[in-house]
Amino acid sequence: MSEYREIITKAVVAKGRKFTQCTNTISPEKKPSSILGGWIINHKYDAEKIGKTVEIEGYYDINVWYSYADNTKTEVVTERVKYVDVIKLRYRDNNYLDDEHEVIAKVLQQPNCLEVTISPNGNKIVVQAEREFLAEVVGETKVVVEVNPDWEEDDEEDWEDELDEELEDINPEFLVGDPEE
């Protein structure tokens, strides 16, 4: 007859993933003639579980290098973009104990410029960006294991004897080099 035990342990009890594409408009001081480059830096975020979702609140800086004055001068304009991504969770565990949990948010795709263009009216810069997150909720859950009544504990002394024999075979002089003068 088998015997079962219930064990409470921590495990990933829910997961979610979200891919986002967004468009941001930047207003430079001077009217742009052409776009020379665009990049995103300084990405920071925090994650919090709210109900059956994880809310990721963060920001990043968009830098756009552009020319103006009929392509005779250049400048870099920077704008901080704030965002909130709400990730729906898929629960994998019906035995999840909702008292305490830990939220782990991982960036699968750092915010990245897809395309940087000049707006149709010619005085703004339009930046298309993308980002992707994976969110996991780690919480306490209950698992049931079968107890093996025939199990015997291994003798640790045998393992220690084998380790002692291996240590005896080591040459203690292998690290010693020629004495320095």
From Swiss-Prot:
GO BP: any one term: sporulation resulting in formation of a cellular spore
Keywords assigned: Sporulation
Region described as Required for deposition of coat proteins: spans on this chain: 1-101
Paired cysteines (S-S): none
KW DNA-binding (keyword) present: no
Annotated spans, Required for the assembly of CotA, CotR and YaaH: 156-158
Spans annotated as Required for targeting to the spore: 102-144
UniProt subcellular location: Spore coat
Region (Required for the assembly of CotS and CotSA): 176-178
Region listing for Required for oligomerization, in residue ranges: 58-75
Pfam family, one: CotE
Alphabetical list of InterPro entries matching this protein: Spore_coat_CotE
Region feature Required for the assembly of CotG and CotB, mapped onto this chain: 159-169
A single MF term (Gene Ontology): identical protein binding
Cited function: Morphogenic protein required for the assembly of the outer coat of the endospore. Is also a regulatory protein for the expression of cotA, cotB, cotC, cotH and other genes encoding spore outer coat proteins.
Subunit structure, as described in the record: Homooligomer.
Protein name according to UniProt: Spore coat protein E
Species assigned in the record: Bacillus subtilis (strain 168)
